[in-house]
């Protein structure tokens, strides 16, 4: 009897872990075996995809995603989350960002394929400074031209308001103070709180976009074929 009990104990000790392990093997494709405990890994990946400095599917871009990104920046008086959807039929490659004031804690996404959207954030400089989050970012398109996006979240709303703008420049052109001044002062900058539609006049493209009016600003832009 004692030998039987020992045998039964050893049998159970070996078989139970094996039975649990088999539940983790979900599918087998070719020479690759997909192993998972449950859906938590997949859900975590989906949740972490929509972060500043990332590229997501263009169809996923929405104001609620930008709100989530803003929350991750923390309590800063002036900040902005930017989402630009590439439906141009072209590939974009990052050039640079110029800041009139403020900074960013993330890197501008390097490549944005067609039907993808870039996510980016900016904020005022850290510390008790009366500055906003103001600048322009530039992407070279596979057409050879440059897409520029200007954003302005000022510190003093008694004198200024949120503004944004988009322009396509001939050839490759990095963002700088001259580009910023042109988009802010001379190229019909766009006011917040309204959906704007505009022909960009280059590469057969147009824009559709919206910017909120508060200090926790969200800017969503769709660049599309005309």
From Swiss-Prot:
Region described as Plays an important role in the hemolytic activity: 50-59
GO MF terms held by the record: channel activity; toxin activity
Site feature (Important in the initial contact with the lipid membrane) residues: 160
Localization terms from the record: Secreted; Nematocyst; Target cell membrane
Residues at which phosphocholine binds: 101, 134, 152, 154, 180, 184
Entry GO terms, CC: extracellular region; nematocyst; other organism cell membrane; pore complex
Propeptide feature ranges: 22-45
InterPro entries: Actinoporin_PFT, Anemon_actinoporin-like, Cytolysin/lectin
Region of interest called N-terminal region, as start-end residue ranges on this chain: 58-77
Main location: secreted
Pfam families found in the cross-reference section: Anemone_cytotox
Region described as Trp-rich region, which is important for the binding to lipid membrane: 152-167
Keywords tagged on the record: Cleavage on pair of basic residues, Cytolysis, Ion transport, Membrane, Nematocyst, Secreted, Signal, Target cell membrane, Target membrane, Toxin, Transmembrane, Transport
Family, as annotated: Belongs to the actinoporin family. Sea anemone subfamily.
PANTHER family: BRYOPORIN
Assembly and interaction partners: Octamer or nonamer in membranes. Monomer in the soluble state.
Domain notes: Composed of a long N-terminal alpha-helix and a core region rich in beta-sheet structures. Before the pore formation, the alpha-helix binds the lipid membrane, partitions into the lipid-water interface and stabilizes the monomeric molecule on the membrane. Finally, it traverses the bilayer, thus forming the transmembrane pore.
Function: Pore-forming protein that forms cations-selective hydrophilic pores of around 1 nm and causes cytolysis. Pore formation is a multi-step process that involves specific recognition of membrane sphingomyelin (but neither cholesterol nor phosphatidylcholine) using aromatic rich region and adjacent phosphocholine (POC) binding site, firm binding to the membrane (mainly driven by hydrophobic interactions) accompanied by the transfer of the N-terminal region to the lipid-water interface and finally pore formation after oligomerization of monomers.
Protein name: DELTA-alicitoxin-Pse1a
Organism this protein belongs to: Phyllodiscus semoni
Lineage, uppermost ranks: Eukaryota, Metazoa, Cnidaria, Anthozoa, Hexacorallia
